[in-house]
Amino acid sequence: MKNGVYYNGQGDFKMETGGVMSELKKKINYTVVCVNEFADRYHLSSKEAFTYLYDYRGIEFLKENYDIEHTLSLAEAVDDLTTICRNNGGRY
């Protein structure tokens, strides 16, 4: 658990106190988790992964498709990010 926040595996991020976060915080935290998962898969730093995902429209994709993407496994979300980025000129 980082910074008192955890992903419950059912599409919700929870605070350590158990309170449900605002929708914006959920989206931000989900994006952070996806960036870190992408970084882990491709052996990048978090900053490198974010820059790559931003440049090749992965971040935009997550923002536009949060309602669907957050219901998938993180592995599936990273697969989707990989596809989006490759379709926009990325190499991963």
Residue ranges of model-derived segments:
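C-terminal alpha-helical interaction appendages
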Residues: V5-Y92
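Compositionally biased terminal segments
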Residues: M1-N3
